[in-house]
């Protein structure tokens, strides 16, 4: 009887137990979706939507300007080793423009823009990958990276087709860093990483900064041999090219003094913080977040072994240091343009991208200890986004009317 009674009790208990298990499984899947998959999908949708938004909304009035004509009007468009503006190696942009010129001519601008927009999206995708690999949660990684997809203060690097060199160097440099982020000795992906590094240095002078950045990151994350392998050959190739082609990063008005260079660095980095935050108090909150996050990570409140800290912070620290390297290298040639030059849209864009991993890491340190602050941190990171959209300026250059007039003349006068 007891066996029969036990069997009967089990028979009546099993359905309830099964229902409880199903409910628990459903709750776990829902929690996982909200915690991991939803922020991933939000970022994917935002990245895909960026392309048509730039081409047909924010950059719809952009047309050929300045340096583009030097490339298009060249003898054959393939002077692959000739410096642009006296200092940049732009072999990759020259190739892209040569192909597009032969296919589309100057009857439409969007194919030229598309090349740059795709590289811009690649750069921000690589940025989010780096942030995630550094140990930042999905929500904070998305909140840090997604607003940069339509970063109005950096609009020049997004809507201007010829920034395929500037933005391209950043994208290829970040791709090199992601590919080189592996364990052990030399692998096939290291070869692919070096290929990305070569594309970076042959897209613009920004490739020099990204090569140094990758070297610093791998020195902290892997070993000195891999760091040297991923930086010294690329820097050597660039140095040889600069020597042979007589490229110079200086200006015609001479070199800046130490104080002038410091002033440039101060102005351009301060402008980056200001434009990222948009609202003054948020800028100071970002600074406070950096201080608190670093203190929690390496100060008396440290709760991880140093080796783990070194590996997690390697890429964000390398990118943060690269801000100062880039600012100083740019200041050497552009210092005479003063604060207005230091606040150039494309500089703010690159520096914002390089800054964001450290900001995200510091936010993660706070959220890891006080989980209830995570939604607050997410909101703080995305709050400037709608305000920064207004910084997109269709009148890049000499104004919309000038662009329309130039476009009309050049596309009809030869008929």
Segments (PLM) and residue ranges:
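Transmembrane-helix signature of polytopic, membrane-embedded enzymes
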Residues: 127-151, 170-171
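Membrane-interface alpha helices of multi-pass inner-membrane proteins
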Residues: 189-205, 210-218
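Transmembrane-helix motifs of polytopic, lipid-linked glycan transferases
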Residues: 114-137, 175-179, 292-299
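Membrane-embedded, lumen/periplasm-facing catalytic core of multi-pass transferases
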Residues: 342-346, 374-415
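Short hydrophobic alpha-helices at membrane interfaces in multi-pass membrane enzymes
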Residues: 178-200, 225-230
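Signature aromatic-anchored transmembrane alpha helix within multi-pass, membrane-resident enzymes
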Residues: 231-235, 316, 364-390
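Membrane-lumen/periplasm interface segments of multi-pass, membrane-embedded glycan/lipid transferases
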Residues: 7, 65-111, 231, 239-302, ...
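Perimembrane helix-loop-helix junctions
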Residues: 4-5, 209-239
